[in-house]
Amino acid sequence: MHYPEPISKLIDSFMKLPGIGPKTAVRLAFFVLDMKEDDVLDFAKSLVNAKRNLTYCSVCGHITDRDPCYICDDSHRDQSVVCVVQEPKDVIAMEKMKEYQGVYHVLRGAISPMEGIGPEDINIPQLLKRLQDETVQEVILATNPNIEGEATAMYISRLLKPTGIKVTRIAHGLPVGGDLEYADEVTLSKALEGRREV
């Protein structure tokens, strides 16, 4: 179907988002066209504001509007326990259960040789530097229970073995192939409680 150029560009923009195919992009584009102009402007401002004002924490790699982030800056947090997750959204999922009191390290990805992503392409070098500089006693590997997440957890555990730092892996109450962000608080809580040393 041939659309006027502004609609085509809007559809193309929506298709750049993960999980949005052509049909959904068309629906979203026409939804935006039906919105009040003020709502569209607010939406556009929110996008620009998020892009301009959010950054990654220089300590843990979590997305934040200040540096260090509110978690790293919280003196009540147990700085000796670092939970390693793949994405900022995984931190949000872990925080929802309101049980974990340590800090995080966000890798912003996972090792995936098929996609050409190696250890140097994600936040692993920063993790190693952080572990040298801080007095960390335990690293909890909370990467996703899929092939890439498991490979990443195994790689990190082998790297940390000589350091003497206790390395644990969250238990799998999580479905294999699933993502942390979709797990409910109870499942995440049980997975954290049942972590094992690796």
Curated annotation (Swiss-Prot):
<comment type="similarity">
    <text>Belongs to the RecR family.</text>
</comment>
<protein>
    <recommendedName>
        <fullName>Recombination protein RecR</fullName>
    </recommendedName>
</protein>
<dbReference type="InterPro" id="IPR023627">
    <property type="entry name" value="Rcmb_RecR"/>
</dbReference>
<keyword id="KW-0863">Zinc-finger</keyword>
<dbReference type="Pfam" id="PF13662">
    <property type="entry name" value="Toprim_4"/>
</dbReference>
<dbReference type="InterPro" id="IPR015967">
    <property type="entry name" value="Rcmb_RecR_Znf"/>
</dbReference>
<keyword id="KW-0227">DNA damage</keyword>
<comment type="function">
    <text>May play a role in DNA repair. It seems to be involved in an RecBC-independent recombinational process of DNA repair. It may act with RecF and RecO.</text>
</comment>
<keyword id="KW-0479">Metal-binding</keyword>
<dbReference type="GO" id="GO:0006310">
    <property type="term" value="P:DNA recombination"/>
</dbReference>
<keyword id="KW-0862">Zinc</keyword>
<keyword id="KW-0234">DNA repair</keyword>
<dbReference type="Pfam" id="PF21176">
    <property type="entry name" value="RecR_HhH"/>
</dbReference>
<dbReference type="Pfam" id="PF02132">
    <property type="entry name" value="RecR_ZnF"/>
</dbReference>
<dbReference type="InterPro" id="IPR000093">
    <property type="entry name" value="DNA_Rcmb_RecR"/>
</dbReference>
<feature type="zinc finger region" description="C4-type">
    <location>
        <begin position="57"/>
        <end position="72"/>
    </location>
</feature>
<dbReference type="GO" id="GO:0006281">
    <property type="term" value="P:DNA repair"/>
</dbReference>
<keyword id="KW-0233">DNA recombination</keyword>
<dbReference type="Pfam" id="PF21175">
    <property type="entry name" value="RecR_C"/>
</dbReference>
<dbReference type="InterPro" id="IPR034137">
    <property type="entry name" value="TOPRIM_RecR"/>
</dbReference>
<dbReference type="GO" id="GO:0008270">
    <property type="term" value="F:zinc ion binding"/>
</dbReference>
<dbReference type="GO" id="GO:0003677">
    <property type="term" value="F:DNA binding"/>
</dbReference>
<dbReference type="InterPro" id="IPR006171">
    <property type="entry name" value="TOPRIM_dom"/>
</dbReference>
<feature type="domain" description="Toprim">
    <location>
        <begin position="80"/>
        <end position="175"/>
    </location>
</feature>
